[in-house]
């Protein structure tokens, strides 16, 4: 969403800031969860989760069909030369939707919201909306999920249910990059904590060192105010 003006961004061994890299390929391996849930109000919980997987799978299906149509056309003019084989297509739109729905319902059950599958976001609490937003990201099977202040828009009593889900994801080995002011959560879950101020990284360390022996004066000042 931002154009870097320097440095590198290495993801799975590839510098995705390189102009030669197809960034869209790597975007499909990343999930994002924002402080505002951004669920579609005109779609049910399960439909919100299904939307991206169905859209991308159907787009890939259309591309395969177009390629096969082109192969059929070119084969008409190959004369005695060997015909090109059609690309295998092992699914259709109905199967794509059925698989996406099955996965979405499984994810809702995982977070205890299977009874909310067919309800609209307007009937959900803030914590429930954010949990649906998180599993909507999981539905794409990402390698990494980026969280931007996922609890900042929630009422205090709803923060815990979202953090518990994120702790469970961390326990399962999901790679997460989290922007947060929840220092207790960061101390418990993170394997590296980075402190930024005015767009600059001032300190980066494992949690025990970050919270136990901070070095930068600005970090010391920050921790003295937020850790009570």
Tell where the protein language model's regions lie, with residue ranges.
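Conserved ABC transporter NBD signature motif
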Residues: 7-14, 18
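ABC ATPase NBD coupling module
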Residues: 16-31, 93-101, 171, 213-214
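Conserved ABC ATPase signature
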Residues: 120-124, 128
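Catalytic Walker B motif of ABC-type/P-loop ATPase nucleotide-binding domains
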Residues: 145-148
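H-loop/switch region of ABC-family ATPase nucleotide-binding domains
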Residues: 180-181
